[in-house]
From Swiss-Prot:
It comes from Bacillus mycoides (strain KBAB4) (Bacillus weihenstephanensis). Signal peptide: none annotated. Residues 579-592 have a biased composition (Low complexity). SUPFAM superfamilies: Actin-like ATPase domain (SSF53067), Heat shock protein 70kD (HSP70), C-terminal subdomain (SSF100934), Heat shock protein 70kD (HSP70), peptide-binding domain (SSF100920). Residues 579-611 are annotated as: Disordered. Induction: By stress conditions e.g. heat shock. InterPro entries: ATPase_NBD (IPR043129), Chaperone_DnaK (IPR012725), Heat_shock_70_CS (IPR018181), HSP70_C_sf (IPR029048), HSP70_peptide-bd_sf (IPR029047), Hsp_70_fam (IPR013126). Belongs to the heat shock protein 70 family. One of its GO terms (molecular function) is ATP-dependent protein folding chaperone. Acts as a chaperone. Residues 600-611 have a biased composition (Acidic residues). This is Chaperone protein DnaK. The modification Phosphothreonine is found at residue 173. Keywords: ATP-binding, Chaperone, Nucleotide-binding, Phosphoprotein, Stress response.
Length: 611
């Protein structure tokens, strides 16, 4: 069976891993890095992904970051006159990770396990699955990030019984999950989180601080200057990382703006204490879901065996201190917070292919599911933290006499009134036979699959008429839209490959021009001048083609010059060999002469032994 790769599709960074020899391994990208920035840039119809896209974000307004925060919404970003959905941008990142995996494995990759924040709702999960399809991947399973981290951690510890808290503070989302490990079973007991809290928010408080300080000093608001804001974002991210290792850092941004007297520079020392002061509210926001998860699991903090930190933002000392204070446990530092989720996804891929045996994963639905009933009340059918996959049915009736149809309004959330929860979808069960209110028996069934994706069925028990819906959120893509995006992604991948080949061809041509100059110089006076002239003429023809950027002409001229240079190189080699042979012959004659000169005449006398 072909390999199933594990992908951590992160807000700020993404990572891909695979099972090899019974161990999950992170696949490095072409630059040799183990994580890839979740950044996409468009420049003259060319798409750039990762570090190269992030590097030019300051000067390129068509750079898209943190798109994961918009998954499952109707948000669109316009680039070069075309609208892109979050699914399409995520698909470009996934294509890049898929290409890295294919280069590493030396085979085509078509299947993946992709992770999502535990607190992602149905629309966000469906959007992630669609992104995978657009990227040309069959998404075999969507699993929760904290659960994936626990899988990677617990793979070697299957014989131990442990209660684990996974605290996952990523670039844009926060999750906390409580799990029990026993005999290879990873059972999620509860989960909680905040999909609008992460490292980006810690960057933002530093940016706000820098903007306020600069405004106080120069009366200029940098937040209105797009380019200055991007420079501030880069500086804030760097300062945040620095302050995990040192107690103060220098932020220096020359020529950040200009005043009446000329250019203005931003120079500021940020201490860890100041950073902790301005980010204290964010750290506190992570503790409420942590307490809720513990309460839902029915565990006291003292019952926990391990606290595992996941996500780059857990390197912040104040975050580590807060979770230590809350649980009374020193956080476990034996996993790499940037890679452990992708490793866990690879383990789940191994479970699905049969490469990993004896592992059972029992996850939960993070939010309650139900329908709207009379008076706008939210009636729950499946409570949050129910183990999935699961199915639950309940019988309802009509609210008016002779009601011909019922509207089924499907919701997800925890609030008592429907209006305060997230609408997943609506559908109708029609053609109900006339009957007094309260008489028809309408059975509503909710199914949640292993990916956490919802199907809802309504059935009139009197007539057996049935209506089924796979929840498609307002932002959800139809199959036709996904198919169109798949084709676009494939054609763009072909175009990207073509552009890559073009760049390589130009590079090879430039290299050949340089090599020709060197060979011609080495052969001056050693071969027929006509041959040198022929090489020079072919070189100039290639240079002209390079300047015109005529790719087919470059290819033809390059091949012609290559042949001439090869012939000249052979001659150069033969001359070098001949010269070496002559030198050897001369040296041999010299050595022989030297031996003759050194001959010594000696007299000898035969001595006969007496017998």
């Amino acid at each position: 069976m072909s390999k199933i790769i594990g992908i951590d599709l992160g807000t700020t960074n993404s990572c891909v891993a695979v099972m090899e020899g019974g161990e999950p391994k992170v696949i490095p990208n072409p630059e040799g890095n183990r994580t890839t920035p979740s950044v996409v840039a468009f420049k003259n119809e060319e798409r750039q992904v990762g570090e190269v896209a992030k590097r030019q974000a300051i000067t390129n307004p068509n750079t898209i970051m943190s798109v994961k925060r918009h998954m499952g919404t109707d948000y669109k970003v316009e680039v070069e006159g075309k609208d892109f959905t979050p699914q399409e941008i995520s698909a470009i990142i996934l294509q890049n990770l898929k290409a890295s995996a294919e280069a590493y494995l030396g085979e085509t990759v078509t299947k993946a396990v992709i992770t999502v924040p535990a607190y992602f709702n149905d629309a966000e999960r469906q959007a992630t699955k669609d992104a995978g399809r657009i990227a040309g991947l069959e998404v075999e399973r969507i699993i929760n990030e904290p659960t994936a981290a626990a899988l990677a951690y617990g793979l070697e510890k299957q014989d131990e019984e442990q209660k684990i808290l996974v605290y996952d503070l990523g670039g844009g989302t926060f999750d906390v999950s409580i799990l029990e490990l026993a005999d290879g079973t990873f059972e999620v007991i509860s989960t909680a989180g905040d999909n609008r809290l992460g490292g980006d928010d810690f960057d933002q408080v530093i940016i706000d601080h820098l903007v306020a300080e600069f405004k106080k000093e120069n009366s200029i608001d940098l937040s209105q200057d797009k380019m200055a804001l991007q420079r501030l974002k880069d500086a804030a991210e760097k300062a945040k990382k620095d302050l995990s290792g040192v107690t103060q850092t220098q932020i220096s941004l020359p020529f950040i703006s200009a005043g009446a007297a000329g250019p203005l520079h931003l120079e500021l020392t940020l201490t860890r204490a100041k950073f902790e002061e301005i980010s204290a509210g964010l750290v506190e926001r992570t503790l409420e879901p942590t307490r809720r998860a513990l309460k839902d699991a029915g565990f006291a903090p003292s019952e926990l065996d391990k606290v595992i930190l996941v996500g780059g933002s857990t390197r912040i000392p104040a975050v580590q201190e807060a979770i230590k204070r809350e649980t009374g446990k020193e956080p476990y530092k034996g996993v790499n917070p940037d890679e452990v989720v992708a490793l866990g996804a690879a383990v789940q891929g191994g479970v699905l292919t049969g490469d990993v045996e004896g592992v059972l994963l029992l996850d939960v639905t993070p939010l309650s599911l139900g329908i709207e009933t009379m008076g706008g009340v939210f009636t729950k059918l499946i409570e949050r933290n129910t183990t999935i996959p699961t199915s639950k049915s309940q019988v309802f009736s009509t609210a008016a006499d002779n009601q011909p149809a019922v509207d089924i309004h499907v919701l997800q959330g925890e609030r008592p009134m429907s209006a305060d929860n997230k609408t997943l979808g609506r559908f109708q069960l029609t053609d109900l036979p006339p009957a007094p209110r309260g008489i028809p028996q309408i059975e509503v069934t909710f199914d949640i699959d292993a990916n956490g994706i919802v199907n809802v069925r309504a059935k009139d028990l009197g007539t057996s008429k049935e209506q089924t819906i796979t929840i498609q959120s307002s932002s959800g893509l139809s199959d036709e839209e996904v198919d169109r995006m798949v084709q676009e992604a494939e054609s763009n991948a072909d175009a990207d490959q073509k552009r890559k080949e073009e760049v390589e061809l130009r590079n090879e041509a430039d290299q050949l021009v340089f090599q020709t100059d060197k060979v011609v110089k080495d052969l001056e006076g050693k071969v027929d001048a006509a041959e040198v002239a022929k090489a020079t003429e072919a070189k100039e023809a290639l240079q002209a083609a390079i300047e015109k950027n005529e790719l087919e002409e470059i290819r033809v001229k390059k091949d012609a010059l290559q042949e001439i240079v090869q012939q000249l190189t052979v001659k150069l080699y033969e001359q070098a060999q001949a010269a070496a042979g002559q030198a050897e012959g001369a040296q041999g004659a010299q050595d022989a002469g030297a031996k003759k000169d050194n001959v010594v005449d000696a007299e000898f006398e035969e001595v006969k032994e007496d017998k």
